[in-house]
Every structure is written in C-alpha cells, then in structure tokens.
Amino acid sequence: MARIAGVNIPTNKRVVIALQYIHGIGPKLAREITSKVGIPDDRRVHQLTDAEVLAIREAIDRDYQVEGDLRREVSMNIKRLMDLGCYRGLRHRRSLPVRGQRTHTNARTRKGPAKPIAGKKK
C-alpha cells in the first residue's frame, strides 16, 4: 500500500480512483494531479514507481490542502462564523440547517431525534 498525505491508498485500484480516498481530493482534482505529474489514467497504484509516488506526494503537499489541514480550516471557518454572531453562525450554534432549508417538518438529521412532547396524546 502506498501512503500519500497520511492515508494508505489501495494498491489494486487505478491511481485516479485511489487518490479519492484522501479527504479533499475528488474526481476532478485526482485527474488534475495525475496529468500534472504525467501518469496515464489507466495506471494502477501497484504499477507506480517510487519516483512517481514521490512526485504525487510532492504535488499534493505543494499545491493542495488535504486531510487534517482541510478539516482544521473548515472547523475554524465555522468557529469564526459562530464568534462573529452572524446568521449562519447562529444557525451552526443552534444545530439548525444553515442554508435556508425548512425546519417545520424536516431537518431531523441536523436537529437530532424527535423529542416527545408531554401531554400530547391522541
């Protein structure tokens, strides 16, 4: 198994697919990285040389923010919104949907399990 950005990527998959196991790299970014390094799309991870793995690792470290750094930045952005006290920050603080979705009936994922109301029987 090759280890890139602190993640063990599977050896039997194509490089473009295997790179997507890294948090912050999707299909488009994976293709961009492989074309930048000069690796064909049909190459599998176990066929890569050590130099190619090193080139991929350096390209990711140099040009992209992935894994722990990306998670940290996202959480810091949410914390900043909460500290500012803006509308989006308040919605995050109250664990409600942030992007304008309705909450009267849905939003159970964000609000958690339904809480029973005392005295309401049919």
Curated annotation (Swiss-Prot):
<dbReference type="InterPro" id="IPR018269">
    <property type="entry name" value="Ribosomal_uS13_CS"/>
</dbReference>
<dbReference type="GO" id="GO:0003735">
    <property type="term" value="F:structural constituent of ribosome"/>
</dbReference>
<feature type="region of interest" description="Disordered">
    <location>
        <begin position="93"/>
        <end position="122"/>
    </location>
</feature>
<dbReference type="InterPro" id="IPR001892">
    <property type="entry name" value="Ribosomal_uS13"/>
</dbReference>
<dbReference type="InterPro" id="IPR010979">
    <property type="entry name" value="Ribosomal_uS13-like_H2TH"/>
</dbReference>
<keyword id="KW-0820">tRNA-binding</keyword>
<dbReference type="GO" id="GO:0015935">
    <property type="term" value="C:small ribosomal subunit"/>
</dbReference>
<dbReference type="GO" id="GO:0019843">
    <property type="term" value="F:rRNA binding"/>
</dbReference>
<dbReference type="GO" id="GO:0000049">
    <property type="term" value="F:tRNA binding"/>
</dbReference>
<comment type="function">
    <text>Located at the top of the head of the 30S subunit, it contacts several helices of the 16S rRNA. In the 70S ribosome it contacts the 23S rRNA (bridge B1a) and protein L5 of the 50S subunit (bridge B1b), connecting the 2 subunits; these bridges are implicated in subunit movement. Contacts the tRNAs in the A and P-sites.</text>
</comment>
<protein>
    <recommendedName>
        <fullName>Small ribosomal subunit protein uS13</fullName>
    </recommendedName>
</protein>
<keyword id="KW-0689">Ribosomal protein</keyword>
<dbReference type="GO" id="GO:0005829">
    <property type="term" value="C:cytosol"/>
</dbReference>
<dbReference type="GO" id="GO:0006412">
    <property type="term" value="P:translation"/>
</dbReference>
<keyword id="KW-0694">RNA-binding</keyword>
<dbReference type="InterPro" id="IPR019980">
    <property type="entry name" value="Ribosomal_uS13_bac-type"/>
</dbReference>
<comment type="subunit">
    <text>Part of the 30S ribosomal subunit. Forms a loose heterodimer with protein S19. Forms two bridges to the 50S subunit in the 70S ribosome.</text>
</comment>
<comment type="similarity">
    <text>Belongs to the universal ribosomal protein uS13 family.</text>
</comment>
<keyword id="KW-0699">rRNA-binding</keyword>
<dbReference type="InterPro" id="IPR027437">
    <property type="entry name" value="Rbsml_uS13_C"/>
</dbReference>
<dbReference type="Pfam" id="PF00416">
    <property type="entry name" value="Ribosomal_S13"/>
</dbReference>
<keyword id="KW-0687">Ribonucleoprotein</keyword>
